[in-house]
Amino acid sequence: AAQQEGKFYVMALGAGSSLYSVYDELVRRYNEKALSFRNVVVFNAYEYYPLQKDSSLRTINQLKDRFLNHVDVAEQNIFTLDGFVAQDAVQDSCRLYEQRIKTFGGLDVALLGVGRSGNIAANEPGSGIQSMTRIILIGNTSREEMENSEQTKETIPPCSLTMGIATLLSAKSIYLTAWGEEKAEIMQKVVENSITDTLPASFLQTHPNAHVVIDLGAAHHLTRIEHPWLVTSCQWSDKLVRSALVWLCQKLGKPILKLTNKDYN
């Protein structure tokens, strides 16, 4: 639609592995001539800092290798945070990034993954809802996750440059992805717990057009999946009855033979 109107469509892209299947699908649709990215402007959501000259860790290169080099987005429409900028110029570089986003009319969409600590982009626990693009120290949990996912022996830098929570929330729509049971616990907290800066992804609950895209594994601890009788009417299978009985016994601290009619109601 943006292309037909001659407008830019501005995307903030995360580089996490949970987004790879999304990018693969976008490339597939491009190859089938179902999509074009000629009017797309891309802003990288975060970058490691400081980076060595020939670093293999650059997230923008990961985005290009997986997605951008395989579609028709113009090179001049791809922007990234500068992992090589001098330390005394970091703040100015981050401010310029915010200004450049505004120059293109703001973000239309943000595609994000979520880390085990509830971080989005590189916004670690403690990031405020009004935070803008800035430098941030990488937390221990995120560092372990990065070391496991990055296929390199190169040392992860101490910091990241990242779009802030407010920057991401300014997008017209947001998509958060997570796959597998290892993300089930954090997704339950992100979706169902209270909004808190100790869980940055929970701020997405405040957005009117935020979407969570997860598989059954990552959804495992959501109430609708794990305890559906609490939120909807159920078709009671033997397995579901057993699950509900175990849950009720644990909740009341009673063995099953001690349950009464009152407990069931």
Task: Go through each PLM region and give its residues.
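A short secondary-structure junction signal
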Residues: 90-92, 120-126, 131-133, 186-190, ...
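Glycine-rich beta-strand-to-loop/alpha-helix junction loops that act as flexible
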Residues: 13-18, 112-116, 179
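Solvent-exposed alpha-helices and their adjacent loops that cap or buttress functional pockets
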Residues: 4-5, 34-36, 71-72, 101-105, ...
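A glycine- and small-aliphatic-rich helix-loop capping segment at beta-alpha/alpha-beta transitions
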Residues: 24-36, 59-61, 65, 125-135, ...
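ATP/nucleoside-binding phosphotransfer catalytic cores, i.e., glycine-rich phosphate-binding loops
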Residues: 172-265
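Class I SAM-dependent methyltransferase SAM-binding "motif I" and its flanking Rossmann-like core
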Residues: 121-165
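Ligand-binding beta-strand-loop-alpha-helix segment within the catalytic cores
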Residues: 33-109, 232-256, 263-264
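N-terminal glycine-/serine-/threonine-rich phosphate-binding loop
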Residues: 1-11, 28, 260-261, 265
